[in-house]
């Protein structure tokens, strides 16, 4: 079910974006409409499809009841990831020549509220519900925890359709997936993702040279290795059915095809 829903979202991603542009008059010229369009797109692409994948359960997820320390760690990891990737992304853009999209900034208090909802809160909630709650947990029982983590991470990054942001999407997706697998609750990746997005908004004018990429990278790598060690025991790789394998290949190749215009 998770793969079928993901395939449907991959096929509808571009038509939904086009439809929203036709529905809302010139969202690029008005910050309020721009944020409303982003919220609507997030809800249609990720929020509603995530409901089709309920309940978000897997036999391989061990639910941890402690929440305060875990939430604090999620805040730290999400914020540090954004800071590290702010230093890495310009190097990646220079290497690949990828174009970076501009985010429209708010001009008043009401627009700031809409901006926080559109850029921080809503994406964290609906994307984590879809990718970690639905896709990751759905794949865990069919192919094992570690392969499910790696594939859901790749699909998350590809489905965002941004070559410039590809390394950053890979990094936060991997860490959110590890958080879900090690703690068993959607709250952990949601908090991590929300802090990652929030740091991007708050630090948007901070020079990349100010970001200590190397020490932050060491910290994040150590955290990722520690979480990986916890999930390795959850089961070996289980071979997918032929139909599921074909569907997964179509999803990955179809999502990757969105990058062709930037690469040629």
Predicted regions mapped to residue ranges:
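Short, Lys/Arg-rich N-terminal segment immediately upstream of the first membrane anchor
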Residues: 1, 64-65, 237-241
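Membrane-interfacial loop-to-transmembrane alpha-helix junctions, especially the N-terminal start
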Residues: 1-4, 185-186
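Alpha-helical transmembrane segments of MFS and MFS-like solute carriers/permeases
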Residues: 4-8, 73-77, 81, 118-119, ...
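Alpha-helical transmembrane segments in multi-pass membrane proteins
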Residues: 5-55, 69, 73-76, 210-219
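Hydrophobic core of alpha-helical transmembrane segments in multi-pass integral membrane proteins
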Residues: 6-14, 45-52, 78-90, 216-232, ...
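Alpha-helical membrane-inserting segments
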Residues: 12-20, 24, 48-56, 81-92, ...
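Juxtamembrane helix-loop-helix connectors linking adjacent transmembrane helices
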Residues: 22-37, 58-129, 136-141, 256-264
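Transmembrane helix-loop-helix hairpins at the membrane interface
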Residues: 113-263
């Amino acid at each position: 079910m998770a793969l079928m829903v993901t395939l449907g979202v991959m096929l509808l991603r571009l038509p939904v974006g086009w439809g929203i542009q036709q529905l809302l008059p010139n969202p690029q010229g008005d910050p309020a409409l721009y944020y409303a369009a982003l919220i609507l797109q997030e809800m249609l692409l990720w929020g509603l499809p995530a409901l089709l994948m309920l309940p978000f359960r897997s036999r391989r997820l061990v639910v941890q009841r402690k929440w305060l320390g875990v939430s604090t760690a999620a805040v730290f990891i999400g914020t540090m990831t954004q800071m590290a990737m702010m230093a890495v992304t310009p190097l990646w853009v220079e290497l690949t020549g990828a174009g970076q999209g501009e985010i429209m900034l708010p001009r008043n208090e009401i627009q700031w509220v809409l901006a926080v909802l559109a850029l921080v809160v809503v994406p964290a909630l609906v994307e984590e519900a879809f990718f970690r709650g639905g896709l990751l947990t759905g794949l865990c029982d069919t192919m094992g925890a570690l392969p499910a983590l790696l594939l859901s991470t790749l699909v998350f990054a590809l489905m965002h359709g941004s070559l410039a942001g590809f390394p950053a999407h890979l990094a936060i997706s991997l860490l959110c997936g590890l958080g879900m697998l090690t703690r068993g609750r959607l709250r952990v990746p949601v908090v991590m993702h929300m802090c990652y997005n929030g740091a991007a908004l708050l630090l948007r004018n901070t020079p990349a040279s100010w970001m200590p990429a190397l020490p932050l990278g060491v910290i994040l790598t150590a955290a990722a290795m520690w979480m990986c060690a916890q999930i390795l025991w959850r089961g070996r790789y289980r071979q997918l059915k032929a139909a599921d394998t074909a569907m997964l290949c179509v999803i990955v190749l179809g999502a990757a095809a969105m990058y062709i215009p930037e690469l040629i």
